[in-house]
A protein has these predicted regions:
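An ectodomain-focused feature that recognizes extracytoplasmic/extracellular
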Residues: 18-73
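Bacterial Sec-dependent N-terminal signal peptides
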Residues: 1-23
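Short, surface-exposed loop motifs enriched in S/T, G, D/E and P with embedded aromatic residues
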Residues: 20-28, 33-34, 83-94, 137
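A structural detector for beta-sheet-dominated domains
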Residues: 23, 50-52, 59-63, 80-82, ...
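Residue-level signal for mature regions of secreted extracellular proteins and peptides
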Residues: 10-13, 62-64, 90, 147
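Mid-length scaffold segments of soluble, non-membrane domains
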Residues: 67-88
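Extracellular/mature segments of secreted proteins
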Residues: 27-31, 78-80, 105, 161-163
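Internal interaction segment
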Residues: 85-164
Length: 164
């Protein structure tokens, strides 16, 4: 009887695991396994989240040509959560004017606090501040908020399997 209830209790977790569709590849230089969400569209940007044994990399690509597309190491990204709390991170990518913005987190067995916040709180808006202090804001609707939360949760949980 206890097993029956424990199986019933775990069914929602199993149904989420089926929704977690990640692309499995190998890093072109190190040949280490790598997971990716692929590019997912959000308003005027696309997002790809990649994980390997060392880090989790968020790559935002600004697709709207009229928005500021130049970023350097002083550029920032701000995640605004429900309740108006914010998390601000610096660009970890190279200087470019192609609309590419990277945010990198360490891939650890225990999820870092900043990354944990992205998993547990719904993100209502994302603001990217470019070289000349111009801001590109991406406002997420309820469905996009849940989709983003699921993507981040999926890549973080599956990324832990790559840690050696």
């Amino acid at each position: 009887m206890k097993r029956f209830f424990s199986v019933i209790f775990l069914l929602p977790l199993l149904s989420f695991a089926q929704d977690c569709k990640l692309k499995k590849t190998k890093d072109q230089f190190s040949q280490e396994p790598k997971l990716s969400t692929g590019f997912v569209p959000f308003s005027s940007t696309t997002l790809s989240i990649d994980a390997d044994g060392k880090e989790i990399d968020f790559l935002f690509t600004i697709t709207n040509k009229s928005d500021e597309r130049c970023f350097d190491d002083a550029s920032t990204i701000s995640f605004v959560f429900e309740g108006k709390q914010k998390s601000i991170f610096r660009n970890t990518g190279t200087m470019n004017c192609e609309g590419l913005f990277h945010v990198t987190f360490k891939n650890l067995q225990t999820t870092p606090g900043n990354l944990q916040r992205l998993i547990t709180k719904k993100i209502t808006a994302i603001s990217l501040t470019g070289n000349n202090k111009s801001v590109t804001t991406i406002t997420l609707g309820p469905q996009q908020q849940q989709e983003l939360m699921n993507l981040i949760t999926c890549i973080v949980n599956e990324g832990k399997t790559l840690i050696k």
